[in-house]
Amino acid sequence: MSRWMDDAVEAYLTDLAGTEHSDPVLVEMEARAEVNGFPIIGRATGRYVELAARTIGARRVMELGSGYGYSAYWFARAVGPGGEVVCTDGDPQNAELAEGYLRTAGVWDRVRYRVGDALTGFAAEDGEFDIVYCDVDKPGYSDCWRAARDRIRVGGLWLCDNVIWSGHVATGTDRDRLPGWTAPIVEHNRMVAEDDRYVGSIVPIRDGVMAALRVT
């Protein structure tokens, strides 16, 4: 839930995404998130990132923060056979869960999962990416952008979740349970907006997705 978008609108977008694409694996992953209070991008945002990836013909995607593979599911659909999604997460259990879910979905052969710090895993990868997707703990957003901005190909995308942060980016306030997390998101959003090599905008789906296209 976005905590700022109207519930009826969010439910409509989610239902519409479910009409366009349904998979029992997604239902399982969403149920786990609901029971455990685990943050996932949700079906409407999932459809959006798949659309974005397909639009630019993405074949190589780097995820900074992957959880148990929900967002990777959508990217793996987009990159197709022979494409690659590199996942990162600090919890080995999430890697095991991701393998189970994505193997069942028939896309595990397109995924490599690095257990450990997201930026350490990113630094260990060579070359450029078509997409770098960021969903780490929010104090790390600016560092992730700094690491990624030179490694996205021209014509590639930077995608970053939770950039509206329940509306707190507009008021400068914090979520009660996560003090100090708003300012780093605001800084990240400003840095992306000010980079002349990128054309970006915040897509107000769920909790907001920054989408920035590298043009030079």
Residue ranges: model-predicted function:
Residues 1-131, 138-159, 163-216:
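A short alpha-helical cap/connector motif
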